[in-house]
């Protein structure tokens, strides 16, 4: 395969102008009028705690330690342990269904 053997470029065909009408076109969505309604939402205590700043279910120190271990090539993965956990989780899912 040679880079020099490429097919010649073909010019793009001209764009045909379309006919426009002088009458204004109304958008059906804009023309509709809707009454505004409000919805009230009440959060559970658990949800309210999750929404508070500073409450995190992620251990950021552990995440940084894992990032550092990966970066340094020091992270050891126990594939057998991971496989066992996946199988156990799949079995639990099958039993609950």
Swiss-Prot record:
InterPro entries: Anti-sigma-28_factor_FlgM_sf, FlgM, FlgM_C
UniProt region (Disordered), positions on chain: 1-39
Start-end of Low complexity biased regions: 26-39
Pfam families membership: FlgM (PF04316)
BP GO annotations: bacterial-type flagellum organization; negative regulation of proteolysis
Keywords: Bacterial flagellum biogenesis, Repressor, Transcription, Transcription regulation
Keyword Repressor: yes
Molecular functions per Gene Ontology: sigma factor antagonist activity
Function according to Swiss-Prot or TrEMBL: Responsible for the coupling of flagellin expression to flagellar assembly by preventing expression of the flagellin genes when a component of the middle class of proteins is defective. It negatively regulates flagellar genes by inhibiting the activity of FliA by directly binding to FliA.
Family: Belongs to the FlgM family.
The name this protein goes by in its record: Negative regulator of flagellin synthesis
Organism: Escherichia coli (strain K12)
